[in-house]
Amino acid sequence: MLLIKCRRLKRGYLLMKDGMGFGWLNTGHRKKLVFMIVSVLLVSIFECVRLGIIMTAKSEYYMQKADELHQRERKIKAKRGRILDRNGIVLAANEVVCTVSVIHSQIEDEEKVIKVLAGELDIDVEEVTKKVKKVSSMEYIKTNVAKEIGDEIRKYNLAGVKVDEDYKRVYPYDELASKVLGFTGADNQGILGLEAKYDTYLAGTNGQILTLSDAGGIEIKGSCENRVLPVDGQDLYTTLDVNIQKYATQLAWETMVKKEAKQVSIIVMRPDNGEILAMANVPEYNLNSPYELNYEPDEEDAQKDKMDLLNNMWRNFCINDTYEPGSIFKTVTATAALETGVVGLNDSFTCSGATVVSDRRIRCHKTTGHGTQDFTHTVYNSCNPAFVEWGRRVGTDNMYLYMGKLGLLAKTGIDLSGEAGTIIHKQENVGAVELATMSFGQSFQITPVQMLRAVSAIVNGGRLVTPHFGLYTSSSDGSVVNEFAYSTQDEAISSQTSETMKKILEGVVSEGGGTKAYIDGYSIGGKTATSQKLPRGSGKYISSFIGFATADNPQVIAMCLIDEPKGVYYGGTIAAPVVKTLYENILPYIGIERAVQLEKNDD
């Protein structure tokens, strides 16, 4: 209505005249009209301001969103670094494989794509059809495809089908050192062992390919393509020696079969610096198929979750599990007694076959008793009642002090994940009985590698080293990138006590309980142990022996543990001979020559 003239003639109305004549306009309508006009103006102003903000302050954000709509990104996988032994022998490598994927919007002949991929990849047609017809930016059909098959698929030149090169982790020795090396997952990321611990160095950095697509999602042929090249991972050189690892594994298998044991572990280490030359845990598992059980499950296992069974199969007994060390721990009690001066080499103890502490009767393994013996022979004889007395003299405070000095109250810091810690009474809760049983290696639990580390410190002059596998990483041209350093605590014990203990432990092998580790022409030191497994009275044992060579200048130390052997279970009888056989084969290999035969064996 064209407003010409208006008069207020009635309450709430205006008389308005236009070209058609006069008419009445409700003033309430007028207010609504004004409100609508003002609202439209305000909304328009707001939108203009918002558009201005978008065009200025947020322009980069929306440009990025637009780019994302038209750019398609594909990864170029980095080659994972290899794992090698100390001599450059490859333990973990890579095999070129392919990843086959489809881009739905680019497919021109769905039926042909489905037929070719199902046939070449040996996949069910329905599964391929579902993925090909799925509307998504990219759909993976299959990974870890053999390169030869990937090359065949490329020859079809199928629109919308991408065949990208990838890498698959392979382990040339299958089961060798499986519980040390670990393995990688589908994305080539380390899951267990050294693969996981050194993943940052091994993984490298993936590259990428960026291509442009039109509004329909079709890749524009000949469009600008940006490539960011991958950075390959670094090679990891380890302390392992393949030849020693092979022999230790073979020996462990033979022992497990012979003794019908649950498992057998052998560790070989340099006591002067903590470099681990071998760590065998049998049964091992196949690194190239780590999700397949290494045994046929019995009825009881069949009821368990498979992941629980796999996790148990992957466990490294040497570091993931604890046990009561038994008589090998007597080396610690003896060391503490000498260091504190509460016992001298000429001190004697008379063993009658048992001793009583509070209300507890503690027996000696020789039920008729050892009679009177000096300190040195209490170690040779591994006499429990004698060590109860030496432990009493040392006292709780000093026992814990020297356990700490020898690394038994803390984790070793070994470069493998999942290391277990010590299980022990709080110091203030240790009474006479607890101290007595601790003195000969019961009532607390440690890992095998903790025990090996402690004995190494006792015989290497008193230096507490860090057991480890990693030496250094190198680039593809062989140049060293990262050299790993490990802590060493000097003077954990005095060099004088260390010298004394070396001589005593040499006597254990030459004339004490460890004679089955004796090798003519070599000076070997060591200590045996037979540990009862909990609960007491179960009839289950862990038999073990730690031996070092040579006794006067230890260059190598080895530990053998036999878990739940059948029949004879004494450590000196079944574990010591394993270390003897090991040393007969590896000592010449590492350059430790046999001395002139001892006179007592000349005839």
Feature-to-residue mapping (PLM):
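Beta-lactam-recognizing serine transpeptidase/beta-lactamase-like catalytic domain environment
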Residues: L2-Y13, A92, D214-E219, S223-E225, ...
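Periplasmic/cell-envelope proteins involved in peptidoglycan metabolism and beta-lactam response
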Residues: L2-P297, T322, D397-G407, A517-Y518, ...
